[in-house]
Structures are given as structure tokens and as C-alpha cells.
Swiss-Prot record:
Residues 1-36, 86-102, 183-190, 269-288, 360-384, 430-486, 541-551, 601-640 are cytoplasmic. Keywords: Amino-acid transport, Cell membrane, Glycoprotein, Membrane, Transmembrane, Transmembrane helix, Transport. Glycans are attached at residues 217, 225, 232, 238. It is found in: Cell membrane. The chain crosses the membrane at residues 37-57, 65-85, 103-123, 162-182, 191-211, 248-268, 289-309, 339-359, 385-405, 409-429, 487-507, 520-540, 552-572, 580-600. Belongs to the amino acid-polyamine-organocation (APC) superfamily. Cationic amino acid transporter (CAT) (TC 2.A.3.3) family. This is Cationic amino acid transporter 2. It is a multi-pass membrane protein. GO terms for biological process: L-arginine import across plasma membrane; L-arginine transmembrane transport; L-ornithine transmembrane transport.
């Protein structure tokens, strides 16, 4: 019974073997350049949020200090981006965070990551398609909405007010474009991205030309007077401003940090670059450059637009839904709103492509590995994942057609933040592993590689304890090169660190008042957590790193990945309970698929069974040869 449980546990953490000699091989068409990747990352990340988010955050959270909010959010996003960039250099294959988890922490975590990325991209595609439809309808006077509400109104809970035929057509059109070929899709994306960037440059330049620096230093007295007028009060005595204390930080630095948490989601989308590993030329160089440059461009755009917006008009007058058209009207440039509308549609188009593009590639990678249904890995004559693309498009179209996606959008955040956290943890684990544990090639025919090379991480932990390989001296004075023992120390420390981060994030979010009130239990839990955290980080720092060099490596290890994990976990804890319930339902469906199909059809399971069969056969042959030799020797020495 125990042996069966151990075998089952090992199967959950079996890792994907990557042949280092075949990293450049691909069944997909390698036709994308570094510029294509930058355009894809910028287009996906710099969506319609740049036209809306700045007004919402500036008015309600940050004021003029929204530029600092975007800077903090950009730094947090860059930490995740650098982790993706290193993995893109190490494993330039299709699959993004799913693949990175598979080669590092095992099959079950890889499936969880991939399954959540599928959810994120499906909801993202559907919601952006509906937003595109709504924006276009608003430009033409709302005729589509009026017509659909009149003839196709739906009154069922959970469903949209009316079916969005326009959004369905958009998704199906995009699916056809992606099925036709990635090269053509990249050209369309570059055109829309270029228009979007040009419009944003126009907005930024206009803002600095027509802006007034006094809008960054509004006095508290002025804000109180405005509050009095708004509330229709006769006297300003004992009246507190509704718009903060004025100045550059009207809501304090706490408001700036709150704005940064919202702005963080504006940088989500760059991870689509990591799914192009088998379709880009020179991926080990292009993927890191694409991720870093696209994040830099997006930060400059968000920083510039938010600065221009808050310079053009006082932050308390900004419109939360469409701030840019109102700002241009405020400075007397009303017709500029049509330029903004064109840019908004282009931004939505690139964002739609950025959500749709990685979805079939995640499906393709999982199906090719056998953890999802095999038919999804079928390729067209143009080397495009046509089956996965059509399945993804159909699913997203149905959701956009029927469902009210507002309640589901928060679920996107769980999938994205979980992927970010896992990739950061995987970078930590991988950098402290012995080279052979990652770089061993696939087993050639007839070669036995069962034994130490087949040990999973959990097995190495058991061996470490059994052999007594870790002492206080070895922890503080480890060898110069990574070993199984030093790798296991890092793995255990990373797991404990993540658990401590979860505890601290939960404590700060739900029991922050207890900490402020200096309650003993809260201070005790916080102090113990911080002590364990410091010990774990210290132990990780003491262990040797691999000397294997790649084209890009995350700097400031282990601090930068750990900080990235903290930011991502903290943001996940902020999500509502309803979101986590919906997430649990989605995961339950995923586990049914994995334990009912994927676990038994995985390529890694087949490879392991083949290796075991070869090893058993060799052992049998060796035993027979020994028996024959022994028998011959006995006959020769027998006195008879």
C-alpha cells in the first residue's frame, strides 16, 4: 500500500525532460522576429486600460502621484518579467509558465498552471471582445445595444443583458486569422500597435503642451471649497475635503501604494511572448529582449499618459470612464476625442489579439505532452495549431455571446498571479540545481537511465534525510558547486518561504487592525513569520548556484524572485471570497480531466514506463548471463 502511495506521489512530481541538443527543433513555423515579439508584448499589455485606468486611479487613489503608482507597478511587473525572460532563454519552447513549471516542479503543478492560464486567456479574450463591441457601439450612438435589447433581451441570472453577436464575429474572425498563420497575424498586430503608440504619443505631447504644473500642486483650501460647493454647504468650517489634502500626494503615500496595486494589472500581458518559443527566430535572445523592451515601452506610455492627463486638468475633475476626451475638451481641443477613439479601438484590437494568441499555444503544448486531449495538438499545413485555435475561439465566442463577464474578470487575476509566482519560484529552484538534473538528455534507445537520474525532488529530499547529508556545518559552509543536498535545501526553503509569505499577506490583509492595535497574538505570529522568512532567505543565499550561463539571467538572486512572489501572493490574497469559490469550481473540473485522462496519457509517464521496461530487461539478461557463467565455472571445476 505504501509503495503504491509513493508511486502515485512520484507521478505527480515527475518532471519534463528537455533535450538541450534539440531546443531549436520545432514543428511550428519559425517566422517571428524580435520586433514582432516587442509589438506583441506592447500590443497585449498596452490595451484599452491606458485610456481608462489613469483617470480612475488618479481621481480615487493617487492624484498626480499616479506617475509614482505606475513606477511602483512597473517595478513589480519587471520582477516577474525578468523571471520569464530567464526561462525563455533556458527553455525556448511553446508553453510559457506551464512548460517552465513542468521542467522544474513537476507535472501536477504544471497542469494547474496551464489550466489557470487557459481560464485567464479565455475570459480575457471574451471580455476584450465585448469591450471592443461596446466601444464601437458607443461611437455609432448605441444602436447595436438598443436593437439587441429590444429583440434579444435575456433575463437569466449570470447571463448578459443581451447576446453580443458583434463580439462573436470578432473572435471568430480573429480565430480564422490565427489559423491562417502566425506571420500574417504578426503583421496585423504591428499595424494596430503602431497606430496605438502614435495616438498615445499625440496624447502625451498634447498634455505637456497644454498642461499646467499648478494642477500638480492644488492647495487643500481649494479642495475644501470645491467640496463645499459640491455638497451645497453654506460654511466651510469643519469641512473635510473629499479629494484628499492637495499637493502631489493628496491621498498620502498610502493612496499612491493603493493605486500601484491597481496599476499592476495594467502590465499584465507580456507573458504572451513566452508562448512563442517555437515560432521565433533565435528565441534564446529574442524572448528576453522582447519581454524587457515591451515592459519598458509600456511603462513609458502609462507614465506619459498619466502625467499628461493630470497636467491638463485637475485630478478631481477627471472622468473615471473616459478621462482623455473630457481632458481634451477641458483644454479646448474637443475634436481630439476622435483621435482618442481611434486609438482606443486599435488598443482593444491588439489586446484582443494578445489574449487570443497565447491561448491555442498553451492548449497545443499541454496536448502535445499528453496532459490534455491529443487532438488539440493537430497542426495545419502552414504549421499553425489549427485544432487548438478553433477550440479556443469557439469557447471564447460562446462566453462572449452569453455570459456577463464582469463577475468572472477577477478570476483572470488568480491565473496570472499564480503563474507569475510559480515562474519566480521555478527560477529560484532551477538556479540552485546541479546542472545534470536539468540538462540530461532524453534516454537513447537501449540505454539504462533508471536510478539516481530518475529521482524526483521529493525522493532527493528523502535521500538527503536518510543519508544524513545535511548538517549545520554543511548548511553554513556548502560545497562550491550545487549538489542534490544543496538543491534540496533550497527547495525546502522556497516552499517554507512561500508559506510564510501567504501567512504574512493574510495577516496584513485581514488582521491589519490587530497589528496596529499591538495585539500580542498578531505581533507574535508576525515576528515568528519574519524570523522564519529571514532564516530561509539566509539559507538560500548560502547555497551554491549553477555555473551554467545563458543569454539572460535574473539579477539580484534570490531577492528579486522572492520579492516578486511576495507581491503576487499579496495581490492574490486581496481577491474576494466569491472569486476563490469560482476558482475552486474551475480547478475541480481541471482535476477531473487530469486524474481521469492527463495523468495516464502523459508522455513523461510513457517514457518512464519504457525506461523501467528497458532496465528490467537488462537486469534479467545480466542475471541470466551470470547464471550461465556460474554454471559453466561449476562444471569446469567439478571432480566428476
Amino acid at each position: 500500500m505504501l509503495e503504491h502511495c509513493l508511486t502515485f506521489g512520484r507521478s505527480l512530481v515527475r518532471r519534463k525532460n528537455v533535450d538541450q541538443g534539440c531546443l531549436e527543433e520545432s514543428k511550428l513555423c519559425r517566422c517571428l522576429s524580435t520586433v514582432d515579439l516587442i509589438a506583441l508584448g506592447v500590443g497585449s499589455t498596452l490595451g484599452a486600460g491606458v485610456y481608462v485606468l489613469a483617470g480612475e486611479v488618479a481621481k480615487g487613489s493617487s492624484g498626480p502621484s499616479i506617475v509614482v503608482s505606475f513606477l511602483i507597478a512597473a517595478l513589480a511587473s519587471v520582477m516577474a518579467g525578468l523571471c520569464y525572460a530567464e526561462f525563455g532563454a533556458r527553455v525556448p519552447k511553446t508553453g510559457s509558465a506551464y512548460l517552465y513549471s513542468y521542467v522544474t516542479v513537476g507535472e501536477l503543478w504544471a497542469f494547474i498552471t496551464g489550466w489557470n492560464l487557459i481560464l485567464s486567456y479565455v475570459i480575457g479574450t471574451s471580455s476584450v471582445a465585448r469591450a471592443w463591441s461596446g466601444t464601437f457601439d458607443e461611437i455609432i450612438g448605441g444602436h447595436i445595444e438598443k436593437f439587441c435589447k429590444m429583440y434579444f433581451k435575456m433575463s437569466l441570472p449570470g447571463l448578459a443583458e443581451y447576446p453580443d453577436f458583434f463580439a462573436v464575429c470578432l473572435i471568430l474572425l480573429l480565430s480564422g486569422l490565427l489559423s491562417f498563420g502566425v506571420k500574417e497575424s504578426a503583421w496585423v498586430n504591428k499595424i494596430f500597435t503602431a497606430v496605438n503608440v502614435l495616438v498615445l504619443m499625440f496624447v502625451i505631447i498634447s498634455g505637456f503642451v497644454k498642461g499646467d504644473s499648478l494642477n500638480w500642486n492644488i492647495s487643500e483650501e481649494s479642495l475644501v471649497n470645491i467640496t463645499v460647493v459640491k455638497r451645497n454647504i453654506s460654511s466651510a468650517a469643519n469641512v473635510t475635503s473629499d479629494y484628499g489634502a492637495g499637493g502631489f500626494f493628496p491621498y498620502g503615500f498610502g493612496g499612491t501604494l493603493a493605486g500601484a496595486a491597481t496599476c499592476f494589472y495594467a502590465f499584465v500581458g507580456f507573458d504572451c511572448i513566452a508562448t512563442t518559443g517555437e515560432e521565433v527566430k533565435n528565441p534564446q535572445r529574442a524572448i528576453p529582449i522582447g519581454i524587457v523592451v515591451s515592459l519598458l515601452v509600456c511603462f513609458l506610455a502609462y507614465f506619459g499618459v498619466s502625467a499628461a492627463l493630470t497636467l491638463m486638468m485637475p485630478y478631481y475633475l477627471l472622468d473615471e470612464k473616459s478621462p482623455l476626451p473630457l481632458a481634451f475638451e477641458y483644454v479646448g481641443w474637443g475634436p481630439a476625442k476622435y483621435v482618442v477613439a481611434a486609438g482606443s479601438l486599435c488598443a482593444l484590437s491588439t489586446s484582443l489579439l494578445g489574449s487570443m494568441f497565447p491561448l491555442p499555444r498553451i492548449l497545443f503544448a499541454m496536448a502535445r505532452d499528453g496532459v490534455l486531449f491529443r487532438f488539440l495538438s493537430k497542426l495545419s499545413k502552414r504549421q499553425s495549431p489549427v485544432a487548438a485555435t478553433m477550440a479556443a475561439g469557439t469557447t471564447a465566442a460562446i462566453m462572449a455571446f452569453l455570459f456577463d463577464l464582469k463577475a468572472l474578470v477577477d478570476m483572470m487575476s488568480i491565473g496570472t498571479l499564480l503563474a507569475y509566482s510559480l515562474v519566480a519560484a521555478c527560477v529560484l529552484i532551477l538556479r540552485y540545481q546541479p546542472d545534470a538534473s536539468f540538462e540530461r538528455s532524453r534516454i537513447s534507445e537501449g540505454k539504462e537511465e533508471v536510478g539516481e537520474s530518475e529521482l524526483t525532488e521529493s525522493e532527493s529530499h528523502l535521500n538527503m534525510l536518510k543519508d544524513g547529508g545535511v548538517t549545520l556545518r554543511s548548511l553554513l559552509h556548502p560545497p562550491l558547486l550545487p549538489t542534490e543536498n544543496t538543491s534540496s535545501v533550497v527547495n525546502v526553503s522556497v516552499i517554507i518561504t512561500v508559506l510564510v509569505v501567504c501567512v504574512v499577506s493574510t495577516l496584513n490583509t485581514y488582521y491589519g487592525q490587530a497589528i496596529i492595535a499591538m495585539e500580542l497574538w498578531a505581533l507574535g505570529v508576525l515576528a515568528a513569520s519574519l524570523f522564519i522568512f529571514i532564516i530561509c532567505v539566509f539559507l538560500i543565499c548560502r547555497q551554491p548556484q549553477t555555473r551554467k550561463k545563458v543569454s539572460f539571467m535574473v539579477p539580484l538572486l534570490p531577492f528579486l524572485p522572492i520579492l516578486s512572489i511576495f507581491v503576487n501572493v499579496y495581490l492574490m490574497v486581496q481577491l474576494s471570497g466569491d472569486t476563490w469559490i469560482r476558482f475552486s469550481i474551475w480547478m475541480a473540473i481541471g482535476f477531473l480531466i487530469y486524474f481521469g485522462y492527463g495523468m495516464w496519457h502523459s508522455d513523461e509517464r510513457k517514457r518512464h514506463l519504457q525506461n523501467c521496461a528497458v532496465a528490467t530487461e537488462k537486469k534479467t539478461l545480466t542475471g541470466n548471463e551470470g547464471f550461465v557463467e556460474n554454471k559453466t565455472h561449476t562444471e569446469k571445476t567439478s571432480p566428476c
